């Protein structure tokens, strides 16, 4: 079974930001080490959307160029119908159990990302989500703080 790391918007935003603080530099080094060690790292479409919309809003052309470069270098996981059907199921279960991860009217990126991981897990893949938001994602998927993914 192959292992794949899905980048959530938090780490993806840090590695695509050309203006770095110490945490972002640490995240860039972490990502490079994953790639050098042969781990498959994938950018989920929903994480790309979350980071891209903010870069576009802020007119961050260098950040967009870096995001596009990462997208070309790493794997990319498009949102599929199967993932959206699973996301709807996750959304309903989370709300019915009193543990929503977003406002009822919001597009819940966390459940979409967790659903993408669940769909990947149905095959020969063992996905782990590298995130800054383990609390919400960890309810629905194998989600770990990005520093803990190796």
Label for each model-derived stretch:
Residues 1-43, 53-69:
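Short, well-structured N-terminal submotif of metal-dependent ribonuclease cores
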Residues 12, 48-51, 84, 137:
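A generic structural signal for short hydrophobic patches within well-formed alpha-helices
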Residues 17-23, 99-106:
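Short, flexible/disordered intra-domain loops and linkers
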Residues 21, 32-37, 94-99, 118-126, ...:
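Alpha-helix termini
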Residues 43, 78, 108, 131-132:
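Short beta-strand scaffold positions
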Residues 51, 105-127:
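Acidic, metal-associated active-site segment
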Residues 73-102:
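Acidic catalytic patch
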Residues 137-143:
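Short loop/helix-cap segments at secondary-structure boundaries that form the rim of catalytic
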């Amino acid at each position: 079974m192959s292992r794949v790391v899905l980048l959530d918007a938090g780490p993806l935003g840090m590695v695509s930001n050309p203006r770095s603080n110490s945490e972002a530099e640490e995240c860039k080094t972490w990502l490079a080490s994953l790639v050098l060690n042969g781990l498959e790292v994938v950018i989920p479409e929903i994480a790309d959307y979350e980071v891209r919309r903010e870069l576009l809003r802020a007119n961050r052309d260098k950040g967009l160029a870096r995001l596009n470069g990462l997208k070309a270098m790493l794997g990319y996981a498009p949102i599929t119908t199967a993932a959206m059907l699973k996301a709807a199921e996750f959304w309903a279960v989370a709300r019915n159990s009193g543990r929503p991860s977003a406002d009822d009217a919001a597009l819940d990126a966390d459940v979409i990302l967790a659903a993408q991981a669940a769909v990947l897990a149905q095959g020969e893949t063992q996905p782990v989500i590298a995130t800054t938001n383990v609390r919400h994602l960890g309810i629905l998927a194998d989600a770990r703080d990005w520093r803990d993914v190796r």
